[in-house]
A protein has these predicted regions:
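Signature for HUH/AEP ssDNA processing cores
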Residues: 117-190, 201-209, 362
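Helical (often loop-to-helix) elements that flank the catalytic cores of nucleotide-handling enzymes
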Residues: 81-110, 163-181, 199-228, 248-273
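C-terminal accessory nucleic-acid interaction domains of nucleic acid-metabolism proteins
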Residues: 1-42, 52, 56, 133-151, ...
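Flexible loop/turn segments at secondary-structure boundaries
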Residues: 25-26, 69-72, 162, 194-196, ...
Length: 362
């Protein structure tokens, strides 16, 4: 097949060159037509205002699939950051990027500085799409304060035996709890089987504080719904449980951004919703590149998300009052104060550990 000629798309005052516009990024499915690279770029132009409202002025990691996405492809890099799969995360702004793009200098868990793309205009997202980006992973901070998150993120992750319907039920319990605590949550589909709930907060707390707030809320959810778990090790989670991934609130940890595409069949979108609309969703695949622009034409369900920024105090009290203590951090983090041993339960020799999970000195 002959290589298609590059085209130029206009995005505000910018012109963005799109190479190989006819490349098939998503193959057709029973419920959605195929998607080309140009259509991906046009999608982000179409949802640009809502996309920027949710993720604007934030540093963002790019999940890139330069050759398009197919089932069976892998997303991976090695320990040195080199691409080893079909897709990869791009955290540093690539060399040769247009000089009009803005960056934010963020720190990794090991205090290594990285200049990441900062989403300051729709054209930046379209340029990233031209570079193969399907999913944007924005930080929970804005460029004005890179050390103080302005949102709490609740990532409800169904385990293999659980379904989207299970996640939706737990999300309703989370909504009820948040409202009891005087907090307002804004839900979205993850673009797969999960659900994300965002709570705007005042940028007055550290990443660790926000993580502890998520743990506190998760433990109260565990008390109210026995399918919810905050267990870090997979061996300790029930197969049909909903894992609240509290570590997604740490520095350099992100979830798929609102209105992002996901590398799944049918070009699904991580779609913001009202609680009422979410309660009606049976199959999140119905919200995809082809259908979301029309859905959004009825109005941005997160239009008022920035109107109120909440305090974390009520959630931090849950963290302090409910039993359980500190939980494990991700493996790329240095050992943290008070953290339990990083030993998988399946690899522990029972007599070497006390009932609190601490290694017994020999």
């Amino acid at each position: 097949m002959a290589k298609s000629t590059a085209v130029v798309v206009t995005v505000g005052d910018r012109e963005v060159r799109v190479s190989s516009p006819d490349r098939v990024v998503y193959e057709a499915t029973d419920w959605a037509p195929e998607v080309t690279k140009l259509q991906v770029c046009e999608y982000f132009i179409g949802v640009g205002s809502a996309f920027m409202h949710a993720s604007g002025d934030r540093p963002v990691a790019l999940e890139r699939w330069p050759g398009g996405w197919r089932e069976g492809m892998t997303l991976s890099v090695d320990a040195t950051g080199r691409q080893t799969g079909d897709g990869f995360y791009s955290k540093r702004l690539p060399k040769g990027a247009p000089d009009w793009l803005e960056t934010c200098r963020v720190l990794t868990p090991n205090d290594r500085p990285i200049d990441e793309l900062c989403l300051t205009e729709v054209a930046a997202a379209v340029w990233a799409a031209q570079m193969g980006t399907l999913t944007f992973h924005p930080w929970a901070v804005r460029k004005t304060d890179l050390d103080r998150p302005d949102e709490l993120r609740l990532d409800l992750d169904p385990q293999p035996g659980a379904t989207f319907t299970d996640a939706r039920r737990v999300a309703a319990v989370a909504r009820e709890l948040l409202e009891e605590l005087g907090l307002r949550g804004y839900p979205k589909t993850s673009g797969n089987r999960g659900i994300h709930i965002y709570v705007r907060i005042r940028p007055e707390w550290s990443f660790d504080d926000v993580r502890h707030a998520a743990i506190g809320l998760g433990r109260e959810l565990e008390r109210r719904d026995d399918s919810v778990t905050t267990a870090w090790w997979k061996e300790e989670r029930g197969d049909a449980s909903i894992f609240l991934d509290f570590n997604q609130n740490l520095r350099d940890r992100t979830v798929a951004g609102a209105w992002s595409l996901r590398p799944r069949p049918g070009a699904p979108v991580s779609t913001p919703m009202t609680w009422e609309r979410l309660s009606e969703v049976e199959d999140p695949r119905a919200f995809n590149l082809h259908t979301v622009p029309e859905y959004l034409a009825d109005g941005d369900p997160w239009a008022d998300i920035d109107e109120t920024a909440h305090s974390l105090d009520v959630l931090l009290r849950l963290w302090e009052e409910l039993p359980g203590g500190e939980l494990n951090f991700p493996p790329d983090y240095p050992k943290m104060p008070g953290e339990p041993p990083r030993v998988q339960p399946s690899k522990k020799v029972a007599e070497h550990w006390d009932e609190r999970g601490n290694r017994i000195a020999e």
